[in-house]
Amino acid sequence: MISAKSVKELRERTGAGMMDCKKALTETDGDIEKAVEVLREKGLAAAAKKSGRVAAEGLVKTYISEDKKSGAIVELNCETDFVAANEDFIAFADALAKIATSTSATTVEELVNEKFDAEATIQEALTGLIARLGENMTVRRFVKFSVDNGVVKSYIHGGGRIGVLVEVACDVESPAVEEVAKELCMQIAAANPLFLSKEEVDQDSIEKEKEIYRVQALNEGKPEKIVEKMVMGRIQKYYKEVCLLEQLWVKDSDKTITKFIDEKAKEAGSAIKVNRFVRFERGEGIEKVEENFAEEVAKQLGK
């Protein structure tokens, strides 16, 4: 019988989870020292101790199926750019993107419970990687696309700093469709649109923008009778900044993205439709902890 006291002591010594500690003690007939070794071998002690540390570095990776009908984008985080450049970390991120493309999982929690290989789940394999490389790591997010008629395309910029996944539909197979998908990936990486079209912009966002522009115009001393006209002009400019189909093409500022797509649709002999896109930027939204080097050294020396 494994006592609660033994489980508590093992948790305090290793930082591993309660169920992992209980399992290790059961395997070792209650021998705490042997249980510590079991947890270390499994990487659970090291992984648990590191799990509280901020992981804001890492890689964004993508994978596209051979038939170009499906693909996935993932973000795998670690603590430093040094580990992000490690071959094992890169290989894990690549494998993760490939698994995400064919999985039925819809959440990260479901994804990490998928099989990584014949021996382990993704979470178990990640735990082992954490133990080997000595940093906290997390599978932060993933998105997968698939299309029956059309292509899924991806683009990685800056060695895994930014990743884009695009789904384009067309009833015919044509080099023009792939060209559209490729150029859209580059556009999204560079211009960072927030929406696909004007119709996707929620009304609350528009009303907030209108109010901001209205106050700005009044503060500039503009007559009230022309303020509304100015506001609508600025809203149109806002659409061109945040909506992919309204943006000017980065390769030719005389064309909007919509015009570029229409031209390619004529080449293909069929309508080309952008179904959806996603853009990941490594670490976006994660608050990094800024360490004071002198304080860190003093802490290490016990001062």
UniProtKB/Swiss-Prot annotation:
Pfam families referenced in this protein's UniProt entry, alphabetically: EF_TS
Coiled coil: none
SUPFAM superfamilies, per database record: Elongation factor Ts (EF-Ts), dimerisation domain, UBA-like
Keyword Cytoplasm: yes
Primary location group: cytoplasm
Gene3D superfamilies noted in UniProt: 1.10.286.20, DNA helicase RuvA subunit, C-terminal domain (1.10.8.10), Elongation factor Ts, dimerisation domain (3.30.479.20)
Any one GO molecular function term: translation elongation factor activity
Protein keywords: Cytoplasm, Elongation factor, Protein biosynthesis
Subcellular location: Cytoplasm
Residue ranges of the region described as Involved in Mg(2+) ion dislocation from EF-Tu: 80-83
Domain of life: Bacteria
GO cellular component, one term: cytoplasm
Family, as annotated: Belongs to the EF-Ts family.
Function of the molecule: Associates with the EF-Tu.GDP complex and induces the exchange of GDP to GTP. It remains bound to the aminoacyl-tRNA.EF-Tu.GTP complex up to the GTP hydrolysis stage on the ribosome.
NCBIfam families: tsf (TIGR00116)
Name the record gives this protein: Elongation factor Ts
